[in-house]
């Protein structure tokens, strides 16, 4: 089960109905902080939850699902926003978060092989006219991007931190030949002080998002991008 907070996307019927409300909530945070005219405007309507209500709903969802899945008192899902019984977690998702190579087949499918990320065309008419020789030569791929070392380090951090177990410092050094602290020491120290990360220095040293960090994961993870 995947459980996320609702995002009202532009161009959808839901956005037509709630777009202005979303913008006002983003600006003011909650209905009580809005100007009187906006409070009156939304009074009695089917309103979207404000930020605090949204977080409370999310925490309740996490706790409830964790208890149903494993009988735990605290949420443990393995992956942020994803829940499964032991042994049934999505292997593709875990592979994606940990940088494992994968091959996507079919229109619009993405792959990661040999440090390169590439995507098959989403145009069916174009795809159907390719010859076997053209397909063998990779003509179906529209976007081919070879990841730089910096990009691979960034992905190791911001994708790996989507796992509740976080990222292991030893694995970072094994992959890139440099200590995690040497590359991201300042960022990690700042996020530790802000209460967004926590570190373990036991036998398997690692860092992971705190409960608060999970709430603002978009901000925390973006700190590892240059």
Task: Give each language-model segment a name.
Residues 1-178:
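C-terminal scaffold of the Radical SAM
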Residues 60, 156, 183-186, 219:
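Long, highly charged amphipathic alpha-helices
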Residues 115-117, 194, 219-221:
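A short, polar/proline- and glycine-enriched secondary-structure boundary/capping micro-motif
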Residues 169-170, 182-183, 200:
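Extended hydrophobic-aromatic, low-complexity segments
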Residues 178-193:
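Short amphipathic alpha-helical interaction segments
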Residues 192-203:
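A short, conserved structural fragment
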Residues 204-210:
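Minor-groove-contacting beta-hairpin "wing" of winged helix-turn-helix DNA-binding domains
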Residues 212-226:
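Short, amphipathic alpha-helical interaction segments positioned at domain boundaries
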């Amino acid at each position: 089960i995947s459980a996320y907070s609702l995002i009202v996307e532009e161009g959808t019927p839901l956005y037509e109905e709630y777009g202005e409300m979303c913008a006002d909530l983003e600006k003011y945070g909650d209905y009580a902080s809005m100007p009187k005219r906006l409070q009156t405007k939304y009074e009695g309507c089917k309103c979207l939850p404000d930020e605090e209500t949204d977080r409370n709903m999310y925490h309740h969802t996490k706790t409830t699902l964790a208890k149903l899945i494993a009988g735990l008192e605290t949420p443990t899902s393995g992956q942020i926003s994803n829940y499964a019984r032991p042994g049934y977690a999505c292997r593709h998702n875990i592979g994606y978060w940990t940088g494992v190579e994968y091959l996507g087949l079919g229109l619009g499918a993405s792959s990661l092989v040999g440090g390169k990320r590439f995507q098959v065309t989403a145009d069916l008419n174009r795809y159907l006219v390719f010859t076997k020789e053209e397909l063998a030569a990779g003509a179906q791929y529209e976007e081919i991007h070879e990841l730089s070392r910096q990009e691979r380090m960034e992905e190791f951090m911001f994708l790996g931190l989507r796992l509740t177990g976080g990222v292991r410092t030893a694995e970072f050094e094994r992959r890139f030949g440099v200590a995690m602290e040497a590359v991201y020491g300042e960022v990690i120290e700042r996020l530790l002080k802000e209460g967004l990360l926590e570190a373990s220095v036991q036998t398997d040293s690692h860092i992971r998002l705190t409960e608060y960090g999970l709430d603002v994961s978009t901000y925390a993870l973006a700190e590892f991008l240059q």
